[in-house]
Curated annotation (Swiss-Prot):
Originating organism: Penicillium brevicompactum
Keywords: CBS domain, Cytoplasm, GMP biosynthesis, Metal-binding, NAD, Oxidoreductase, Potassium, Purine biosynthesis, Repeat
Disulfide links within the chain: none
Biased composition (Basic and acidic residues): 518-527
Pfam families: CBS, IMPDH
Quaternary structure and interacting proteins, as annotated: Homotetramer.
Protein's recorded name: Inosine-5'-monophosphate dehydrogenase
Gene Ontology terms: cellular component: cytoplasm
PANTHER family: INOSINE-5'-MONOPHOSPHATE DEHYDROGENASE (PTHR11911:SF111), INOSINE-5-MONOPHOSPHATE DEHYDROGENASE RELATED (PTHR11911)
Database matches in SMART domains: CBS (SM00116), IMPDH (SM01240)
Activity regulation details: Mycophenolic acid (MPA) is a non-competitive inhibitor that prevents formation of the closed enzyme conformation by binding to the same site as the amobile flap. In contrast, mizoribine monophosphate (MZP) is a competitive inhibitor that induces the closed conformation. MPA is a potent inhibitor of mammalian IMPDHs but a poor inhibitor of the bacterial enzymes. MZP is a more potent inhibitor of bacterial IMPDH.
Pathway listed: Purine metabolism; XMP biosynthesis via de novo pathway; XMP from IMP: step 1/1
Binding-site positions, NAD(+): D277, S278, S279, G327, M328, G329
Length: 527
């Protein structure tokens, strides 16, 4: 008969057990015993809840220098991230990586749009001259997706301020050939150079103007402040911004020498982080490119990859990488593992590379294999600082391309892997030059293109302004269940064995999903 113990001694009796319930992460991922695992093959065991989900911080480093407030990145794929996605990912606390399957000038223009979108003091505003026509002002409004352009004597910064042309001034003006001086507002509220951002915000707040020009003692325009940016600061408190209040922006380049010119254009446009994009990151080409970037642009942080082993990581860290991108063949539109017989299951990859990179203070990004919110949490638990998403974001409003109705009657958007034949043979986006898909997979000179990806479609997910907050809230609740209040505590708990894991059999995976119902509706979130 089992002895019934004093219930008040339960916590003391628990200490008699040699280890916590479940498995240590190293036991979980011991591939010698049970093969390498991926996200569906395990669960994280719950801990103790002593705080609210709202108190969970998701601040994380994506490179040695840059920290974001939501551990989420959008992939540099031509059906996922252009300037609209990059802007909204940054506003929501993450980071968008603009793809490079386009001419360098087009990519630089996208970077420029991100950097202009939200600012404190706008140090390089779009300035009009007295000879600019109303029609030209309308074209600029369409191009930049904002209005309120200062007009100066020379049409440049550091020139005498004459007025401001607002959207209302030009919207219904019937003679487009008129100069903007005929419609501009001259009743201006300005602030003197040297005004602090807080003081300037207060002047703008108390005025009824949309823009606040900052002028020097001679009345020359030196910068601009926007009321719409104040509203963005209220609506997007997690925004990934620099001290200058500009949004953080990343963009991809290939390992080819020709992209050195591309990178110069991106840097001139204001780029913060460059992602050296390759399907197999441990190459002489990428190592040479990293070293060149470090010597030429020391203020630009480099995310290198993709890799799946410690050996690959060591080579890129030694070359100077500031962050690592993990994943090979695990993406939803990727067939590298099937075709090349090269790669690694994503859970094993993330743990191996992240544990090694952490010893050098290099953050890692789990890229690929993410099918749902739970996979994001598992990637973070295995040591990644952030998770990169492709197909999860491809169906959102902010991704490139138009919606269409599938044969099944669903609203979908096109999505294609960068290793697909559709991308490798697409000369349109690349401007007839080198193709980013072929470059990524070292196939640009091949007579026979071997696909390492597929093209397809993904179901409409709505706007990321709703979807990303759902992901953020879900990660916070998950960390609350695990019993850790931030990502550093999660990583520490996993490493010291306090955060435990359990493997899942096929039956366990079935049990952990919806089962036994006649029918159901799977609505993931409401807002």
């Amino acid at each position: 008969m089992v002895e019934i113990l004093d219930y008040t001694k339960a916590l003391e009796v628990l200490k008699e057990y040699p280890s916590g319930d479940g498995l240590h992460v190293d036991t979980l991922l011991d591939s010698d015993n049970h093969g390498a695992l991926t996200y569906n093959d395990f669960l994280i065991l719950p801990g103790s809840i002593t705080f609210s989900a709202a108190d969970v911080s998701l601040d994380t480093k994506v490179t040695r220098r840059f920290t974001i407030k939501a551990p989420l990145l959008s992939s540099p794929m031509d059906t996922v991230t252009e300037h609209n996605m990059a802007i909204h990912m940054a506003l929501l606390g993450g980071l968008g990586v603009i793809h490079n399957n386009c001419p360098p000038d087009d990519q630089a223009e996208m970077v420029r749009k991100v950097k202009r979108y939200e600012n404190g003091f706008i140090l390089d505003p779009v300035v009009l001259s007295p000879s600019t026509t109303v029609a030209e002002a309308k074209e600029l409004k369409t191009k930049w997706n904002f209005g309120g352009f200062p007009v100066t004597e020379k049409g440049t910064l550091h020139s005498k301020l004459l007025g401001i042309v607002t959207s209302r001034d030009i919207q219904f003006h019937k003679t487009p050939e008129d100069p903007v001086t005929a419609v501009m507002s001259t009743d201006l509220v300005t602030a003197p150079a040297g005004t602090t951002l807080a003081e300037a915000n207060e002047v703008l707040r108390s005025s009824k103007k949309g823009k606040l020009p900052i002028v020097d003692k001679d009345g020359l325009l030196v910068s601009l402040l926007s009321r719409s940016d104040l509203m963005k600061n209220i609506h997007y408190p997690l925004a990934s911004k620099l001290p200058s209040k500009q949004l953080l922006c990343a963009a991809a380049i290939s390992t080819h020498d020709a992209d050195k010119v591309r990178l110069q254009k991106l840097v001139d446009a204001g780029l913060d982080i460059v992602v050296v994009d390759s399907s197999q990151g441990n190459s002489m080409y990428q190592i040479a490119m990293i070293k060149w970037i470090k010597s030429t642009f020391p203020d630009i942080d480099i995310i290198a990859g993709n890799i799946v082993t410690r050996e690959q990581a060591a080579a890129l860290i030694a070359a100077g990488a500031d962050g690592l991108r993990i994943g090979m063949g695990s993406g939803s539109a990727c067939i590298t593992q099937e075709v090349m017989a090269v790669g690694r299951p994503q859970a094993a990859s993330v743990r191996s590379v992240s544990a090694f990179a952490a010893r050098f203070g290099v953050p890692t990004i789990a890229d690929g294999g993410v099918q749902n919110l739970g996979h994001i949490v598992k990637g973070l638990a295995l040591g990644a600082s952030a998770v990169m998403m492709g197909s999860l974001l491809a169906g959102t409003t902010e991704s490139p391309g138009e919606y269409y109705v599938s044969n099944e009657g669903q609203l979908v958007k096109a999505f294609r892997g960068m290793g697909s034949i559709a991308v490798m043979e697409d000369k349109g986006k690349s401007g007839g030059g080198k193709n980013a898909g072929a470059s990524r997979y070292f196939s640009e000179n091949d007579k026979v293109k071997v696909a390492q990806g597929v093209a397809g479609s993904v179901v409409d997910r709505g706007s990321i302004t709703q979807y990303v907050p759902y992901l953020v809230a879900g990660i916070q609740h998950s960390l609350q269940d695990i019993g850790v209040q931030d990502l550093e505590a999660l990583h520490t708990g996993v490493n010291n064995g306090q955060v435990r894991f359990e493997m899942r059999s096929a039956s366990a995976q079935t049990e952990g999903n919806v089962h036994g119902l006649h029918s159901h509706e799977k609505k993931l979130y409401s807002s």
